Amino acid sequence: MSSTSQVALLPKLSLPDGVTVWDGTALEYERRCNNVDEHAVHLMQTINILGIRSKEAQCLNTVLTSVARLRENRQARVYLLCQDGYGVGILKMGVKKLFVTHPSYSSLVEIDPLCVLDFFVDTSFQRKGFGKTLFDAMLLNEGLNPGEVAIDRPSVKFLAFLQKYYGLVEYTPQSNNFVVFHRYFDKWQPQRGKGHWGGNAVPTRSLVRPQNCLRVYPKYQSTTGPNNNFEEDATHRTPPPPPLPPPLVPQGSVTSPGVGKKTAYELQYEEYLREQAYRRRQGGDPRLQPVPNPVSSSEIVAASCGARRRMSPTRSGVQYNIISGTPEH
């Protein structure tokens, strides 16, 4: 299929050429606050379509990249590569907790690296340097070296890609089908007395950048590779509005039962404390005084009403006390 027919199936995007990163929160913000001319709808359609194409190209049983999955896993993010206003590639990243075999100790260790969960460049744009542009943008934005990234079930083409551009070759086959290159273990040593990797085993990396300060990768220039410089796109995205202040509750109002109002047990305990204090002032030892019989909570509530007894008229018009049931005169 030609490049024109492939692109025709994708909606036009109002994004600059280059790489942008999206997570579930950023997509939700676009849908709510920045959906001019169906921009957010087209963006989500592009991510879903490229996710389906990635599934078909890799002969997978399920779609790995979709807007729904990004909403379910807020830690995952997708790097989207655009060219001439259309999405041409995606790279999905996320942190995973893995138990892998250490290449030197031949024992299982626990790590939680940033993982490549899905990587796809549209077939019409392959072998033109777009894949390296996308991968380099991810490494620069995350602050990682190529060997510090784990890959979920990489294809033969992906492994050849990593060997060609980053010299990643040596890895130990794992039962979970994740590929963790030996370079990942160069910086870390297991802690004594523990059968797993230390708590700080994950490489230092930057957090997900919010969409309002997203760095956009520069426009693709040639097949010689990117220049590894991000440029701030301050005019394309407006910052999200500040969070709304909490609602004001007027004094004396009760928002829900029990808020700003003491329970019967609290009233009973306060009455007990007042009685003990009174006995101390009288000079007696409260521990030697007889303990009064406990009072039920309903009696405390009834006593606290005092003169404000709840009244209810009968059919005959005679008022009675709804607590005692006696007529009122």
From Swiss-Prot:
The answer to keyword Translocase applying to this record is no
Q: Which InterPro entries does this one have?
A: Atat (IPR038746), GNAT_ATAT (IPR007965), WRKY_dom (IPR003657)
Record-marked site positions (Crucial for catalytic activity)? Q58
Enzyme group, top EC level? Answer: transferase
Q: Quick one: a GO biological-process term for this protein?
A: regulation of microtubule cytoskeleton organization
Which EC number(s) does the record attach to this protein? 2.3.1.108
* Domain N-acetyltransferase residues, every copy: 5-185
One of its Pfam families is Acetyltransf_16
Question: Which protein family is named in the record?
Answer: Belongs to the acetyltransferase ATAT1 family.
Protein name (record)? Alpha-tubulin N-acetyltransferase 1
Organism expressing this protein natively: Trypanosoma cruzi (strain CL Brener)
